[in-house]
Amino acid sequence: MTRIQASGRSVLDVIRTRRSIPRMKPDPIPREVIEQLLDAAVWAPNHWMTEPWQFFVLEGEAKRCFAEMRRAVHRARLPDPDSPQAQNALEIAYRATLNTPVIIVVTSRVAEDPEVREEDFWATFGAAYAFMLGAWSMGIGTYFRSGALR
């Protein structure tokens, strides 16, 4: 996440102007700010009242482990992972992950019932989006990334 200029924004302005910020400033995000955003996120609509979302706040060693895991996943997808170009790209992505002040991983429990599972998926997305909108309203940029969704 990264700080941007923001103050007194309306909800509509925040929705219209929020953008993904792929390059993060290294400025730390205070823990109390993260907690405020998490508190807002869990108010996302959830028809079945399952509250399926889980938020993992990664800093320090956890962030380093995540960066290594992410590098391994990307490496496995490359046709020639040992080429100099691939090695350079992997290192750049690894460093960018490490330089991000905090990483919030959002997951969802997977219900057996397909209808509940679908609702939980969208409720979790809503919670993540609420987090991002709240961050933007506080002058903090975010970048949404997803892996396999189904």
Residue ranges and their predicted role:
Residues A41, I104, V110-R150:
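Small-aliphatic-rich amphipathic alpha-helix that forms the alpha element of a beta-alpha
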Residues C65, I92, I103-V106, A130:
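Generic beta-strand or strand-like secondary-structure segments
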